[in-house]
Amino acid sequence: MAKKIVGFIKLQVPAGKANPSPPIGPALGQRGLNIMEFCKAFNAKTQGMEPGLPIPVVITAFADKSFTFIMKTPPATVLIKKAAGVQKGSAKPHTDKVGTLTRAQAEEIAKTKEPDLTAADLEAAVRTIAGSARSMGITVEGI
């Protein structure tokens, strides 16, 4: 028989930097899960990634205090800011532009995000990324 699921926990954890401090500790502790076991497993899985890159993770907690977790791709906004070389988006996105993004950069981000996007093909994914960039006040060239 399958294990009984008691809940899901959604967190954004920096790659390679999971530790028992908030927000991880309290979220897992409430469900009675082994915090250090998750931290070690997460850090091992994110070893090859850029340290500090926020990784969304969905933890499935089971009744027997065990768990599994699924890592998603980093948020599009983080990847866009990194590619455009800006610290944060514009306060007035449609009037003040803070950076530029080329089509090649948008395609690279779309390829990274493809597993989590609902886009039908790469072109649709690129347009989705371009729309996110525009809403952050970043000009997109070639789209």
Swiss-Prot record:
HAMAP family registered for this protein in UniProt: Ribosomal_uL11
SUPFAM superfamilies noted in UniProt:
Ribosomal L11/L12e N-terminal domain, Ribosomal protein L11, C-terminal domain
Tell me the InterPro entries matching this sequence.
Ribosomal_uL11 (IPR000911), Ribosomal_uL11_bac-typ (IPR006519), Ribosomal_uL11_C (IPR020783), Ribosomal_uL11_C_sf (IPR036769), Ribosomal_uL11_CS (IPR020785), Ribosomal_uL11_N (IPR020784), Ribosomal_uL11_N_sf (IPR036796)
Q: Which family does it belong to?
A: Belongs to the universal ribosomal protein uL11 family.
The organism sits in which domain of life?
A: Bacteria
* CDD domains, alphabetized: Ribosomal_L11
Name any one Pfam family assigned in the record: Ribosomal_L11_N
* A GO molecular function held by the record: large ribosomal subunit rRNA binding
Q: Which SMART domains match?
A: RL11
UniProt modification remark? One or more lysine residues are methylated.
- Subunit organization: Part of the ribosomal stalk of the 50S ribosomal subunit. Interacts with L10 and the large rRNA to form the base of the stalk. L10 forms an elongated spine to which L12 dimers bind in a sequential fashion forming a multimeric L10(L12)X complex.
Organism (species): Bordetella petrii (strain ATCC BAA-461 / DSM 12804 / CCUG 43448)
Q: Which UniProt keywords apply?
A: Methylation, Ribonucleoprotein, Ribosomal protein, RNA-binding, rRNA-binding
Sorted alphabetically, the Gene Ontology cellular component annotations on this record are:
cytosolic large ribosomal subunit
The name of this protein is Large ribosomal subunit protein uL11
Which purpose does this protein serve, as stated in its record? Answer: Forms part of the ribosomal stalk which helps the ribosome interact with GTP-bound translation factors.
Q: Which GO terms describe its biological process?
A: translation
Look up keyword RNA-binding and say if it applies: yes
